């Protein structure tokens, strides 16, 4: 699986820490960083769009910004993207099981690195349940 990851300045430090952790935790996943390149102030939408535009059926994304609202809103403008703003492991689980989320949006100012790692682990290891949820997910794209 390929993973695209991106953040704005508020999520930069957590993004870098998650990349280092994921290389060890998920060695078979190919990680491509779509930016930002530093903690210098930048526009979240640029990096949310870069991740969303890169997605396909065999990939997932992770986006980080201060609240994760901006990156989620921007990413969800793209057809086929289901970016889920998560702040607990349980919400990340439900986002995968019920919504087939393909982007995990993390509010870097409101969760610890340990919570972010738990959500990422769940995001990769939790399958979509399908069934009654599949017909609901099919209704998302206009």
Provide a role label for each language-model segment.
Residues 13-24:
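Short, solvent-exposed amphipathic alpha-helices that sit
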Residues 2-3, 58-61, 80-82:
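Short active-site oxyanion
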Residues 63-109:
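Mid-chain, well-packed structural core segment of small domains
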Residues 46-67:
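Short, structured active-site "lid" loops
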Residues 29-41:
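A short beta-strand-loop structural module common to alpha/beta enzyme folds
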Residues 4-6, 10-13, 89-142:
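C-terminal binding/interaction regions
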Residues 15-16, 72-74, 115-116:
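Short glycine-/acidic-enriched loop or helix-start segments at secondary-structure transitions
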Residues 6, 34-36, 86:
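Conserved beta-strand termini and adjacent loop/short-helix elements that scaffold enzyme active sites
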């Amino acid at each position: 699986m390929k993973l695209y990851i991106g953040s704005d300045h508020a999520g930069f430090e957590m993004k870098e820490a998650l990349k280092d952790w994921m290389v060890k935790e998920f060695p078979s996943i190919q990680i491509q960083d779509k930016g930002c390149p530093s903690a210098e102030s930048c526009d979240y939408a640029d990096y949310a769009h870069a991740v969303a535009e890169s997605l396909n059926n065999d990939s997932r994304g992770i986006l980080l910004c201060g609240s994760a609202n901006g990156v989620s809103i921007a990413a969800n403008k793209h057809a086929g993207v289901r970016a889920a703003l998560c702040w607990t492991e349980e919400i990340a689980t439900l986002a995968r099981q019920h919504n087939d989320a393909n982007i995990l949006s993390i509010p870097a100012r409101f969760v610890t690195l340990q919570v972010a790692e738990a959500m990422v682990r769940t995001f990769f290891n939790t399958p979509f349940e399908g069934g009654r949820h599949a017909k609901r997910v099919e209704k998302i794209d206009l």
